[in-house]
Amino acid sequence: MFLPHPLLPDLKDLASATAVDHGFELADLQVLAHMQPMTVQIQIRRSSGDDVTLDDCAAFSAPMGEALENSAVLNEAYVLEISSPGIGDHLQSDRDFQTFRRYPVDVIHRDPDGAEQKHSGTLLERTENHLKISIHGRIKQIPRDSILSVELTNPTG
């Protein structure tokens, strides 16, 4: 069972605010605590939808590092990695789900008994309460609060 790092909420708040201050939005943040030193991976995107360049990532690294140092959220050595999400990543934001409607996805969720289930189908929509996918022409509604991940897939493979 995957347990999120206890500092994740504070780190996400800090990274999100720093990203907004510099014209970006936070796409994802992961803490790889098993690495020595610990690694903080931050993915940013432009709210306009424009591509994030390597120069953008490099330029964002300094203010993000400064924000981390000034916040005292982390009190151990760490490596900071800044990148942008690419195709094949997990879908997370409302924008992701709008952009990739009618694309093939894998959905991993927990059934009512707590067992992990995986469904592959075509993304139809995400509502406030459900994710709808088409599996061989049949619509499946999956409760949002049971979803562990939604990832773009290759339709042939």
UniProtKB/Swiss-Prot annotation:
Paired cysteines (S-S): none
GO cellular component terms listed in the entry, alphabetical order: cytosol
SUPFAM superfamilies xref list: YhbC-like, N-terminal domain
The entry's keywords: Cytoplasm, Ribosome biogenesis
Compartmental location: Cytoplasm
KW Phosphoprotein (keyword) present: no
Database matches in InterPro entries: Ribosome_maturation_RimP, RimP_N, RimP_N_sf
One record GO biological process: translation
Chief location: cytoplasm
Gene3D superfamilies, A to Z: RimP-like superfamily, N-terminal
UniProt superkingdom: Bacteria
Functional summary from the UniProt entry: Required for maturation of 30S ribosomal subunits.
Family per record: Belongs to the RimP family.
Entries under NCBIfam families matching the protein: PRK14634.1
HAMAP family found in the cross-reference section: RimP (MF_01077)
Record-given protein name: Ribosome maturation factor RimP
Source taxonomy: Bacteria, Bacillati, Cyanobacteriota, Cyanophyceae, Synechococcales
